[in-house]
């Protein structure tokens, strides 16, 4: 976000295309974060009654390991996808219709 608010580049305008890309990146990051949160919560925190207000040492270690593994695998898969040149515009024929619909929906707001 500092890219958009950087005072050193005050004369530079931000294009709508860059804002759209930033929005897609934010949505992807938010989705990844929520996926990590729900997966690690399900795996590491017991569902029965909570005896303590804080996490136990075992729960903390479990969450740390879980988040590290999820982050590592996400980076590994992302790197693989980038090296293979996979992109929605190449492999997903309906992507351009999706992007056009998203932009149209956003402009109505």
UniProtKB/Swiss-Prot annotation:
It is a peripheral membrane protein. GO terms for cellular component: mitochondrial inner membrane; mitochondrial intermembrane space protein transporter complex; mitochondrion; TIM22 mitochondrial import inner membrane insertion complex. It comes from Saccharomyces cerevisiae (strain ATCC 204508 / S288c) (Baker's yeast). This is Mitochondrial import inner membrane translocase subunit TIM12. The gene is TIM12. SUPFAM superfamilies: Tim10-like. Belongs to the small Tim family. It is found in: Mitochondrion inner membrane; Mitochondrion intermembrane space. Keywords: Acetylation, Disulfide bond, Membrane, Metal-binding, Mitochondrion, Mitochondrion inner membrane, Protein transport, Translocation, Transport, Zinc. Disulfide bonds join 40-66, 44-62. The modification N-acetylserine is found at residue 2. GO terms for biological process: protein insertion into mitochondrial inner membrane; protein transmembrane transport.
């Amino acid at each position: 976000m500092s890219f958009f608010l950087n005072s050193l580049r005050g004369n530079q305008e931000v294009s709508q295309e860059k804002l759209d890309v930033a929005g897609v990146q934010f949505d992807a990051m938010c989705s990844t974060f929520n996926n990590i949160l729900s997966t690690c919560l399900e795996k590491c925190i017991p569902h029965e009654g909570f005896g303590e207000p804080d996490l136990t040492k075992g729960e903390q270690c479990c969450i740390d390991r879980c988040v590290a593994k999820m982050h590592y695998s996400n980076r590994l898969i992302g790197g693989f996808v980038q090296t293979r040149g996979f992109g929605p515009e190449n492999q997903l024929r309906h992507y351009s219709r999706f992007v056009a619909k998203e932009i149209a929906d956003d402009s109505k707001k």
